[in-house]
Each structure stands twice: as C-alpha cells, then as structure tokens.
Amino acid sequence: GCRLWQTSGLAKRLISGKYLSIVLRGRHDAICHAPSAGGGKYPPALVGICEVENDSVLFDLTKRAGLREHKYEYIITNSKDNRGSNTALLYQRDRIKIISKRSYTPTLQSDPLKTTRDILHVTGKVINDEILDIFVCHFPSRREGIKRTRPDRIRCAELLKQKADSLFRIRKKANIIIMGDFNDYPNDISLRESLGARSIKSRVSDKNLYNMFYHYSDKTNTGSYKYKGKWNFIDQFIISGNLLNISSKISIKGKEAHVYSEPFLLHDDNKKYGGQKPFRTYSGFKYLGGYSDHLPIYMDLIIKD
C-alpha cells in the first residue's frame, strides 16, 4: 500500500505491497529528516511540498543529499508567486507511474495583479493500475488580515472545486487527494462551502469531497500548526468519497489521517502559552536550527490487487 505525507511542503510514501503513505510537510528544510524517519523501514512513495524555492533545491535534496538513496524524482511548479515559492511533489518511479502533470494559476480577487503559488495537479497510476489524482496547494496567507485575504482563498478553493468536478465527470471512480497548507481551518467558508469538503463522518458519496481533519476542528490539543498557544489544522488532506469506501481498489487505511509529531520536530513554547510547538528554522532573522513551523501530516492508502 502507500503512505501519504504532507509537510509545510508535502510528502508521500508507498510501501511495497499493501500500503501507500502520503505525507504533507511544510518546508523543504525538514524534508530530509522527517520523511525518512516517518517512513520507518520504507520512505514515503509520495512527498508533497507546499513551499520550496526552486528546482535546484529539490535536485540537491533528491540527487545529492539525504534522500538520494530513496531514488526520488520530483515535479515542481513555476509559480509567479510574489514570495518566490512553489509547490512540488516527490515520488518514487517504481511506486507510481506519472501520466500527466499540470499547474493552475489562481486569479486573486483582492488584486488581479497579485500572484500566489500555483496549484500542482499530478495524475499517476499506482501498482494495481488505478488512477490517482493528486493536488498540492498553498493558499494565500492571512498576513494582511483574515477578512481582507479570505476572498483570495475562496478563489483558490473555487478553482480546485472546478478541477475536482471535472474529474468526477470523466472518471467512473475518481481517486482524488488534495493536500496542502490552506491557511484556513476545515470549517472555514473556503473549504466547507466553496470547495464543498465535508466531514468524513457525514454520509459519503463517491462524487463528493471530504476533509480528513474536519472532525478534529473542536479538539483543542491537536493540530499541525500552533498559533498563539492554540493548535489547529491549516494543513489538511481532502479526498474524494471513493477513497473512504473499504471495498474500493484504493482506500484510506482506517479512514484516518495523522499528524507526525516526533520529539525532534518539537520544542518548548514560550512561558505565556506553555507546552510545545513545532521547532521552526527561523524566528524572524534569528536562526533556530529546527525543521518547520508546521508538523507533517500523513495517511496510508490500502491498494488492492
């Protein structure tokens, strides 16, 4: 199967046989250690990265640095983002065969001339010949204010919804995985209404989208990101209903997604908030030596013959 990882960038893993693991991670700087550790005996087959500067970073990461032994290839967008960051997907060729790759550029409502990260869409065939459609996203931040920037995230969600609906029309059983840093919570308008991502605990239909972390919204001590002492999920997996059907040829193991929160990814929060928080690389211009201000998330896919 497979394991899917997301970091503040994104990571995904396929184990030989029955499980595909998908991971979403934050930035590339933590990719080297976290996916290797998170994969256990086998590295993630797919690794999604939400924030990476350029092609050369991924080349060094996969061909020269710590991930070289895992024989990853990569796909990266060429966004016109104001901050110079892109989304990307690492994959192992013996675990998934890439059929097509494309990127979509959202038009932002707040300023048509303003740019953000492109949405990466990769279509691949896994070991049982089932088709998997993977989207890697990084929605516009809240830095300029939640209300002011909300329309931009809604625009991105509407674009994603359009692409997902197109796949629902052309595929008999669409296997869609949308992952990324959405800069919104599962129950925010952009994801709940514009994208239409529901709770996995609601009635499931093959033609709808479901948020693997929607039902975590009210839990106070879990999340991928900590802001002012409160944990929450702005990093999420959103999937098509077919992946929640245990009789499908691809399904999500245990209908669960997880946060990877090993001690090396955490350090003590300040005295005001207490507890721990993700061990980030920088605080302003000060180098801290950590991995990311987001924790990776992951889930396993069961792949049937």
Per-segment meaning from a language model:
Residues L46-G48, V52-F139:
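Structured beta-strand-rich core segments of catalytic domains in phosphoester-bond hydrolases
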Residues G1-A65, I75-K80, S85, N270-G275, ...:
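N-terminal, active-site-proximal structural segment of metallo-dependent hydrolase catalytic domains
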Residues G1-G17, S100-R102, I131-S141:
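Active-site-proximal beta-strand elements of phosphoester/diester hydrolases
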Residues Y74-I76, L120, G124-Y216:
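Extracytoplasmic, non-cytosolic globular domains
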Residues S56-F59, R83-N86, R143-I146, Y185-S190, ...:
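Extracytoplasmic/secreted cell-surface and envelope-processing proteins
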Residues L14-G17, L24, I31-L58, L90, ...:
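Active-site beta-strand/loop signature of hydrolases that rely on acidic residues for catalysis
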Residues R13-I22, P43-I49, I76-T77, L108-Q109, ...:
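Second-shell loop/turn segments in exported
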Residues K114, D165-I176, D184-D305:
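Metal-dependent phosphoester-hydrolase catalytic domains
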